[in-house]
Amino acid sequence: MSINVFLTDKLPKQKDNIISIISFVDKVEYIDNILSTGLFSYGRKNVYEVWETSDEVSHEKYNDIYISKNNNYLFGLAIIENVGSYEELKLNIQKKYSDFYKISDENKMSIVKIWHYLPQLLKTYNDKKTNYSLLCEAREIVYKNYYKDLSYPAATVIGIEGNKILIYFLAAICKNYKVIENIRQVSSYNYPQNIFSEKPMFSRAVSFKTTYENVEKIIISG
């Protein structure tokens, strides 16, 4: 019941065991279980990132969150229209984050990484806050209620063009879950607030081993 991630220029013919297919074109959409991130590949060539598992995958939807899962892994995604005030966008992201954890808990899984694609990532509001700020604030509200320690998932945040916010995550049934920090770096949640207005909350990496596998995996931020 393993997971294998690889790049290919052709869509797989057999999709029963595919938990995610990510396409690199300059628009955000989810059609026929293929996710487009708003980023295009070098030379605009057809490139697909395929997440293949060793057992069958089912698909469902919860509160506008698309879910693909099997006995070991769960992939979920949400697309949010980038409209409204700072507080409205922050609340929308906060609600999706809360739903991510509700879905994962109901499936007895732990989120190991969350990816974010935000339009106008460093757009400045009147109070000098940015779209990255609102993401950090929304995430902090959820994490303070969910985590009693600093065992946050890994994360990626990328700025894109367009008017849609994309957030997706990977969760797993974890026999072991351990966060990894880089001793040569200040941990994100310890950034000095007199220098950084944002308070990112993520781990540099997460190592985990699923219940049905003997191999430990490491998933990194960035």
Show which residues each predicted segment covers.
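N-terminal presequence-like segments and the immediate start of the first folded domain
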Residues: 1-115, 122-222
